[in-house]
Regions:
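Hydrophobic alpha-helical segments typical of transmembrane helices
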Residues: 2, 6, 38, 108-109, ...
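Beta-alpha junction/loop-to-helix N-cap segments that form part of ligand/metal-binding clefts
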Residues: 1, 13-86, 157-162
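Conserved donor sugar-nucleotide recognition element shared by glycan-biosynthetic enzymes
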Residues: 31-35, 59, 102-106, 133-136, ...
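An alpha-beta-alpha
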Residues: 92-159
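A short acidic, amphipathic alpha-helical/loop segment
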Residues: 62-66, 139, 167
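Short, polar/charged alpha-helical segment
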Residues: 1-17, 138-146
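Short amphipathic alpha-helix with an adjacent loop that forms part of the alpha/beta core around
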Residues: 166-172
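A generic secondary-structure signal
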Residues: 9, 13, 41, 111-116, ...
Length: 172
């Protein structure tokens, strides 16, 4: 990975202040409860000086109270929930994001549908068990309607669903 290559390069050049960098990995199984346990071990036992990850917003949300309490910076490479870096209007001091947010994605999708695809009537199928999916659908709907588009159908499903006939029949 790019991180490993960068660490190798720094270490070959003598490290930082003569100290070699090391990567400590931990699998949180993309489960918030596991993420909390995983980051607790990284911070309290492995004594890491920074955390890169987790991948999902839910896992980052479970990790940030632990990293923040221990003043360990956490870089969220792909957690897109708006409250990852800001909560109640206040910037979280030890949490950083290196990607866009859910509202940005929903807006860009609607703008693309309007400008590039010239779509005016839209049906939305979203995962009601996912804050990510619900957030995208909400912002997409708002932006599309502001641009004069019409949401002709909005149907929810659950991630565990295997049959989408009912929702698709309603949209048709």
């Amino acid at each position: 990975s790019g991180l490993k290559m960068a660490f190798d390069e720094v270490n070959k050049a003598g490290g930082i202040d003569g100290k070699k960098l090391r990567i400590v990995e931990s699998d949180n199984k993309s489960e918030p409860s596991e993420a909390g346990n995983s980051v607790t071990k990284l911070v309290t036992q492995d004594k890491v000086i920074a955390v890169v990850g987790p991948a999902t917003s839910g896992c980052v949300a479970a990790s940030t109270p632990i990293t923040t309490a221990n003043k360990v910076p956490l870089i969220a490479p792909c957690a897109t929930a708006p409250n990852i870096t800001v909560e109640n209007g206040k910037v979280k001091e030890f949490v950083f994001r290196s990607c866009f947010t859910d509202p940005f994605q929903g807006r860009v999708m609607a703008e693309f549908a309007d400008k590039n695809l010239k779509v005016k009537n839209v049906a939305i199928l979203y995962d009601a068990s996912s804050d990510y999916s619900k957030g995208l659908a909400e912002v997409f709907t708002k932006t599309m309607e502001e641009k004069g588009g019409k949401i002709v159908a909005k149907e929810a499903f659950l991630a565990k669903d295997l049959d989408f006939k009912s929702a698709l029949t309603k949209i048709k």
